From Swiss-Prot:
This is Crossover junction endodeoxyribonuclease RuvC. Gene3D superfamilies: Ribonuclease H-like superfamily/Ribonuclease H. The keyword DNA repair applies. The lineage of its organism: Bacteria, Pseudomonadati, Pseudomonadota, Alphaproteobacteria, Rickettsiales. One of its GO terms (molecular function) is crossover junction DNA endonuclease activity. Mg(2+) 2 binds at E67. It comes from Rickettsia akari (strain Hartford). Homodimer which binds Holliday junction (HJ) DNA. The HJ becomes 2-fold symmetrical on binding to RuvC with unstacked arms; it has a different conformation from HJ DNA in complex with RuvA. In the full resolvosome a probable DNA-RuvA(4)-RuvB(12)-RuvC(2) complex forms which resolves the HJ.
Length: 157
């Protein structure tokens, strides 16, 4: 089973690919997709989709795990994040990926044992749980790894 973990965002989206090999989880790859806030939204969404599509084609995941988003006090920000999530889900649907969504607190609790963990705690635990992640420094990327990890752990339960 190969899971594509996604920390959705319009400005700096984190993605990660984590595979289960027998009883072990293996980190395969991760990255961030940055878009320019000055670009039109459709161009930003196209950038996200084209980059994620390359990841899907290269790693052939069976499933996508996406962090659920909370409603921001700024309705415009929430709406734009909704656009990004919709574009991502549409892309996953085009490649017949099963989609699982996880609340941020669930991801934090699964990875750190504490549902209100800080970004640096998630980053620290990811490095302990998955060999190959020691050079990860970006919190969006770490969140995506944590989301993929959570998906694997939750599927076993």
């Amino acid at each position: 089973m190969i899971v594509l973990g996604i920390d959705p965002a319009l400005g700096s989206l984190g993605w990660a690919v984590v595979a289960r090999q027998l009883t072990k989880l293996k980190y395969l790859a991760s990255g961030i997709i940055k878009t320019n806030s000055k670009d039109e939204i459709h161009n930003r969404l196209a950038c996200i989709n084209s980059t994620l599509e390359k990841v899907i084609l290269e790693y052939q995941p069976n499933m996508a795990a996406i962090e659920e988003t909370f409603v921001n006090t700024n309705s415009v920000t929430s709406l734009k994040l909704g656009y990004a999530r919709g574009a991502i889900m549409s892309l996953c649907g085009r490649y017949n990926l099963d989609i699982r969504e996880f609340k941020p607190n669930t991801v934090k609790k699964t990875v750190t044992g504490y549902g209100h963990a800080e970004k640096d705690q998630i980053l620290h635990m990811i490095k302990l749980l998955l060999p190959g992640t020691s050079l990860i420094t970006n919190s969006d990327e770490a969140d995506a790894i944590a989301i993929a990890y959570t998906c694997h752990v939750m599927r076993v339960k």
